[in-house]
């Protein structure tokens, strides 16, 4: 779990997302409250439930990106799902309980990786020993008059020399034959609602078939070392302990990001005739958000302390169109602002992995030096903003379209311009995009 303070979390988010201070503060406080709750003594700790967040704002302003970056900072089980993928129980489609099942799978993978990191150095030593056993078989018993001690000393000295060469990578390209455990056979079974437990038993029965069998393979030592390290680390893990920790991690620290929640409101679905009732999805989501127990293959998982962050553009609907019970489960509401020309300019250059840096790095691989003048950046931002105003407002995503169109010719012929410098200024931008950005019909289809 992350121990960062809210200010540190906001500072990290600022490296990747421009503006939206209110939303950043809300998620930073929510994340910090997970840590604070863990410090509270037990009877009261169970009563402290997370305050779920509803983010409201047009598309392309950073709602999903905030959630994505938060997942990396949280060091906790995190899943992002679209509310539109789910249907009311009884209809064809995914039911909402699968959210928790997917989350627990992510948690198990996360926990297993964390536990494997703890034993990796010991596993690496054992993997090295196995490779050295292949390269340097143990000497046969020495006959009459032989000096067994002397032979062992020689063998140990040779082993240490080979171990040093192995660690320095001098033996990486040498091939060895080794016996590796075959991975268990994966099998997916479509399960009707309520029959998950039975299908899990069938799946585990099939996965056990063939487990423990060895397969002889010829691989390079570099790959062999990795494969054997993973195999040795897996042997050291206690799978039951991993599952218990994973379930506990989901229950105490899990975060679910529900995107497009505005698309399942009743107003958004008026006059839809025979379409699946989206209001039914809201009713199915309600117990999950309120706190319920979901049956998974790793055991029962309580959702009482899972943090839910919902987001939606709410163009055609209002938050009040959600059913009242669900509205009450998202007490913290944050409105995200539309992006200005200055925001677009900052997105292009001010973030850690800005679009400008990405394209410069891509073209540098072909020895083309791409430079952006300040007036060129400003003009790009103005065009992106203007096209959003005139056509559909898709927020920062418009920049991808505009810059891709701008650099289309440079990217296409980069191989013929190795060692050259290309400067993107306002004149270059107008020459490449002027006609398209001015003509509304053209910009509708091209940008």
From Swiss-Prot:
GO BP terms: protein unfolding; proteolysis involved in protein catabolic process
Principal location class: cytoplasm
Signal sequence residues: none
Cell compartment(s), UniProt: Cytoplasm
Residue sites binding ATP per the record: 18, 60-65, 259, 325, 397
Pfam families referenced in this protein's UniProt entry, alphabetically: AAA, AAA_2
Keywords carried by this UniProt record: ATP-binding, Chaperone, Cytoplasm, Nucleotide-binding
SMART domains linked: AAA, ClpB_D2-small
UniProt GO molecular function: ATP binding; ATP hydrolysis activity; peptidase activity; proteasome-activating activity
Family (UniProt): Belongs to the ClpX chaperone family. HslU subfamily.
Protein's UniProt name: ATP-dependent protease ATPase subunit HslU
Organism: Burkholderia cenocepacia (strain ATCC BAA-245 / DSM 16553 / LMG 16656 / NCTC 13227 / J2315 / CF5610)
Gene: hslU
